[in-house]
Amino acid sequence: MLHKFLIAVAVLFSACALYAQKSVSSAVSDIEDDPSNGLEMCRSLFNEYFLSELTTHEKVNMLDTKTVQKALSDLDLSRGRNLTEKEIKNLCAKLKTDALCLVKMSRGAKNAIVITVRIVDNKGKEVGKVTASMKGIGDTDATSHSMARDCAVILRKIRGIVPPKPLAP
């Protein structure tokens, strides 16, 4: 009898803990990227793949591109420069998100495409940065997958959700 009671209590506490862990919400934008660097198509493709990876595979609550673009337009933010802390706060408030994933692309050595995702919280503070390089547009899927996985870990830490450590062999 006591055993059944303890199991019921454990299940109740587990359910409460899961309910209390509100997931992180975020948005992806390339507002800070230089619009004249010739990578528009690649950037657009990467953003959609990256957004899909975060939403589908990493289970992060992400806003759709149209909502983000409307908020950027409403706030009259100009492209190609780093957002200020105040602008980030205002954008997060308008979008009702915990964080932003700000994507930048550039050409690196041997014409590689270097992607940097800067993650900022809704207070405007940078909480992490993930960088990767791809040889061409054909690497978009694999690169977006690995970057989304790394960014999801950083995004979850904003809410205090830390991934479990792997068991020792």
Stretches found by the model and what they are:
Residues 1-5:
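Positively charged n-region of N-terminal signal peptides that target proteins for export
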Residues 37-46:
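Glycine- and acidic-residue-enriched helix-capping/strand-helix junction motifs
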Residues 115:
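Beta-strand acidic-aromatic groove motif in beta-rich domains, primarily in extracellular
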